């Protein structure tokens, strides 16, 4: 099976996972280390910690998919090191109606108008939600505070974001730090291996 077919099959399986689990990813984050990070296990560990940070802050099991990519441009200082992409679900409407204590403290300090709107039963703007998610990501020590270290975008094309995350192939997905059904991925890996051996 050639790389393009394998990648397309992998994306198809991930899309099925999205449909079956009802995930609606809202945010696409690109996180670049301050330095050339060459330890894959450290990057995976950082993904696990960042996922815990998000869930702890919102006090909700927000689903995250993590991808690890290599810097491929030999003219750049991070060449051969890794950076991360994350697809992140938005906090639920219930959570926005009844924010966690950490959310309330953060909003009181950084966005009191939004906290007032919540307490008055009003709507929270997408911009306010985005601002809070960016601050939450920056709470994690592995995420640089500067604009070059973290790029957070709202997702308007989930399929396009998924395709972008898989552009370096199936090895970029970090399943141990992603909310996904391992059975489907394992079955796919087994079937792919069998096709390669017997075709």
Question: Residue spans of the language-model regions?
Answer:
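Right-hand nucleic-acid polymerase module
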Residues: 1-82, 90-199
């Amino acid at each position: 099976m050639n790389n393009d077919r394998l990648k397309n099959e992998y994306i198809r399986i991930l899309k099925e996972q999205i449909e079956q689990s009802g995930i609606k990813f809202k945010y696409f984050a690109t996180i670049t280390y301050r330095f050339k990070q060459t330890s894959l296990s450290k990057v995976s560990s950082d993904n696990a910690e960042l996922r815990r940070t998000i869930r702890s802050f919102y006090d909700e099991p927000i689903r995250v998919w993590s991808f690890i990519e290599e810097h491929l441009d030999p003219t750049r200082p991070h060449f051969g090191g890794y950076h991360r992409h994350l697809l992140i679900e938005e906090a639920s409407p219930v959570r926005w109606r009844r924010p966690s204590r950490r959310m309330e403290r953060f909003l009181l300090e950084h966005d009191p108008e939004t906290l007032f709107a919540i307490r008055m039963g009003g709507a929270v703007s997408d911009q306010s939600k985005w601002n809070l998610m960016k601050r939450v990501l920056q709470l994690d020590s592995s995420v640089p505070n500067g604009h070059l270290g973290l790029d957070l975008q709202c997702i308007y094309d989930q399929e396009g974001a998924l395709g972008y995350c898989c552009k370096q192939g199936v090895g970029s997905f970090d399943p141990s730090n992603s909310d996904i059904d391992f059975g489907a991925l394992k079955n796919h890996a087994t079937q792919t291996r069998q096709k390669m051996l017997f075709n």
